[in-house]
Amino acid sequence: MHDLPPDSGARRGGRGLADHSFPAGARAPGQPPSRGAAYRRACPRDGERGGGGRPRQQVSPPRSPQREPRGGQLRTPRMRPSCSRSLESLRVGAKPPPFQRWPSDSWIRCGAHRDWDEPPPRGGRMDGWSGDRARAAAPTGLQPPGCKDHGCSSGSPFRDPAGSSVIRSGKGDRQEGPSFLRPPAVTVKKLQKWMYKGRLLSLGMKGRARGTAPKVTGTQAASPNVGALKVRENRVLSVPPDQRITLTDLFENAYGSSMKGRELEELKDNIEFRGHKPLNSITVSKKRNWLYQSTLRPLNLEEENKKCQDRSHLSISPVSLPKHQLSQSFLKSSKEYCTYVVCNATNSSLSKNCALDFNEENDADDEGEIWYNPIPEDDDLGISSALSFGEADSAVLKLPAVNLSMLSGSDLMKAERHTEDSLCSSEHAGDIQTTRSNGMNPIHPAHSTEFVQQYKQKLGHKTQEGIMVEDSPMLKSPFAGSGILAATNSTELGIMEPSSPNPSPVKKGSSINWSLPDKIKSPRTVRKLSMKMKKLPEFSRKLSVKGTLNYINSPDNTPSLSKYNCREVHHTDILPSGNTTTAAKRNVISRYHLDTSVSSQQSYQKKNSMSSKYSCKGGYLSDGDSPELTTKASKHGSENKFGKGKEIISNSCSKNEIDIDAFRHYSFSDQPKCSQYISGLMSVHFYGAEDLKPPRIDSKDVFCAIQVDSVNKARTALLTCRTTFLDMDHTFNIEIENAQHLKLVVFSWEPTPRKNRVCCHGTVVLPTLFRVTKTHQLAVKLEPRGLIYVKVTLMEQWENSLHGLDINQEPIIFGVDIQKVVEKENIGLMVPLLIQKCIMEIEKRGCQVVGLYRLCGSAAVKKELREAFERDSKAVGLCENQYPDINVITGVLKDYLRELPSPLITKQLYEAVLDAMAKSPLKMSSNGCENDPGDSKYTVDLLDCLPEIEKATLKMLLDHLKLVASYHEVNKMTCQNLAVCFGPVLLSQRQEPSTHNNRVFTDSEELASALDFKKHIEVLHYLLQLWPVQRLTVKKSTDNLFPEQKSSLNYLRQKKERPHMLNLSGTDSSGVLRPRQNRLDSPLSNRYAGDWSSCGENYFLNTKENLNDVDYDDVPSEDRKIGENYSKMDGPEVMIEQPIPMSKECTFQTYLTMQTVESTVDRKNNLKDLQESIDTLIGNLERELNKNKLNMSF
């Protein structure tokens, strides 16, 4: 087969093909004087030889070994574009070499008696294509080479500069006779301009061999049913080898044995462009048109030929065809699917009535000017057997190389052209010469599949810079470059489907701005089509080169090319990977694809240039209709997790995306003790967490909370942890003030009890962390398991708000030896002021609070109170207005005792109490402790082993705890419960070395003592049970110290002795205050510390059945004697009305009157009754509100 240079007429549609293929005035030996390409099938060819003096350069074409009776070669004219301008000086001689014809061309029916140079009609149909011409019979015998007809002697059959021809093959039952087709006309001037604009010369085009092809001898029988379409070879002009584009590179016989890797590589080079935007496109309307018209396509070629005359729009699908075309074979043998497609010559006169789909991207106007990558349809429609081409409005045409069979043959010929007047006219004729052999004969699957395999391998590895791989399956813009009409050889039914009967007209002055693919108005349609794609695993893996090559190299690909093959080959061209960044810019379907493994288009280059910090986050969530714009997978997931669910991608690959080596392992137990503080603005960014859940649990809903010095600052949303790595992407900006510790707490949500449970936690020491560097990436070790990857940044550092607290200042109260504190305060007492003030305030207003010392106060308020004691313990006031929550004060007191360097109950005292317990154990009964009074005195004497300051402090503390325990009927804090709260505090054996804060013990005995919390509780319980009650100790000691607070101590009242059985005989049982169910004085979350066994199960469930078992503390009866003692006042300041006898339906006015009772009442006689009346008031109010029978009167 001759190699056709880039300036050949077959490539550009001028006169180049004819002028370069035949000498002037000569024709092929077997060429009749008829005009059309169809005559090539009816015309006999005795020899395939050039008729001019110009020597031909040939290469061996693919042969059909089953049919070479005449020794003829399968020569296929190749139209290859070139970027070279060196051919501008080339001119065709007067007698170009004759155009060689194939014997099988005699089966192409064309119109007869048309001159080669005669322009085609403009009236919407071409005479050469008319029905009467199509019905002209072609002789089965071969005509002599000397036969002549109109225009034969004038030169090349492709001389007409404005027209083009289509070689079509009909069914075998059609008549045979001389018919004529108009050749494509390509001028040298146009060809040179196209070559200059094409820029399609690649490295593989330079080293083409120039051999002489053997002459064709003998004859070859042409059968209407079996004969393959063979296109005659053309003459080649002598051009430099670096500018020569061989004909065989654009025309491939699907006969597998003759397809070589070199030709496939050159084929790929030809279909790849640089710097041009696609002209044609796949729109939703276009796909609908394909489906609609494919159902209407007749199987009869005669009917199709008749329809072809009146059809004004012919769609050449640039991408995949419907399923019925992908799965059907069209030709019967390997010799029957030679395709000859020539797209050349612009003819504005042909575009008025026949507009091809080459410009059908204008149909996308109703779709928002979009174009999609091909999406094969699953609809099984009828098989279309006719191939019809008409005139086109498009200036340029480009079709995918192997993605679909546009023609039934396996040989591929592409022609590309630029319009000469593309900017001034949108009417361009793209006459197409196509050859199709017998309509429904199946193709041998091995040949075309081999071609596709080799072709895809070439495409998969070819990644030259500047090659627009993505452009190959699409039509080029008529105003922005060149295009190719590609007829691919595959085993599918490859035919051109007609376009919509009402396509949008071509817009002359505006081409679609493909650089803005965001103008997509139908994401729902894309999603629907994408869901169909996901049925094929190869396509849902974004069709990477690796996946494509693995598929093509498998031995299972020998059957006919199915939809899988077609789709893979196509996406090899438009692979949205790093091979072609320009192609990725226009890869619209990858953005609008529900497969989250496909990288987004906008973020693609960014991800290539630098590693993304995160992948999933909650990120962008699809609303169910519009596809996701951003990927949920990392770069690892995009490469290795194709087709997987988004959960698998986002959870399993996020750990690989972050650079774990960049995170420094951080453990709180390894950090030195820090007494400094820091203030400023801190940024915390979570990257992810690891090993948060046990492997046996399928999933866990968790969230992470940020605490600064035990104060909640921020939290994440509820996240689902399904794998060992929890992907996170959360940033928080937190203001810190005098902060020390950043605590990261992971909570797990338990839906059954509907509460949060601490899963794990980790702590970071902020002052030490930010001492040198302000930014740290830490892998914080969590307890009891797990790691959390976090980036902590101190964006701004402020001065500490505590005036007396510098960042390097050591604490003076907390964590300091008690003797040093007392010496520094120097107030004449042996007890630190913190203990004194806290105990005094608790006894003043907290002894009757339920759960005292068991409930936790606000961490923020506790921190504030701690700082106040650190500044000046003498100036701290604990009045109720400033600290209304008594639990804050109790919390600070326990913190102080817990942080003492040495416990108050020393090891010596601990052992002494254990000996006393062995000698004189507790004698407990229902009435309480029944030990001898001597045991109490002996217990007090046990403290003599302590130093003076520790002894005085412990005595004050035990007195206070004994007083609190005396109110256990109200506050439920018995000696046992108090021992549970204070045992680990007073007996902790904590000794911190200078470098680490983890606990160390000098010997095994101390270790056993520190871990034996039960013993601690028993020791303290023994002391409290035998400790004598000294109620006025605190009052006497504080009267001299704080005279200004003397009056406040009058609120302390001694509770009356409680009867063992409440006598209800003299009271109205209906007026007795009944505790409300679930009446709590504190939140539920604070009520589960320590041992509540002494409270019993019926504490909150008091009913009528157990009324006699309930202890009511000073609950008076509601009779008329309540107000009798309130008639006299000591002062005139407050006037209290005599309350009327209260009944069950007492009025609210009475309650308000009783609330006005002040401390001016005689404290000796009325204080107790006043308190009881207030309790009654509150109880009655609650009861009335619960019954919704409150009668308010003001």
UniProtKB/Swiss-Prot annotation:
Residues 1-106, 133-182, 1057-1080 are annotated as: Disordered. Keywords: GTPase activation, Phosphoprotein. This is Rho GTPase-activating protein SYDE2. GO terms for cellular component: cytosol; synaptic membrane. Gene3D superfamilies: C2 domain (2.60.40.150), Rho GTPase activation protein (1.10.555.10). One of its GO terms (molecular function) is GTPase activator activity. InterPro entries: C2_dom (IPR000008), C2_domain_sf (IPR035892), Rho-GAP_regulator (IPR052118), Rho_GTPase_activation_prot (IPR008936), RhoGAP_dom (IPR000198).
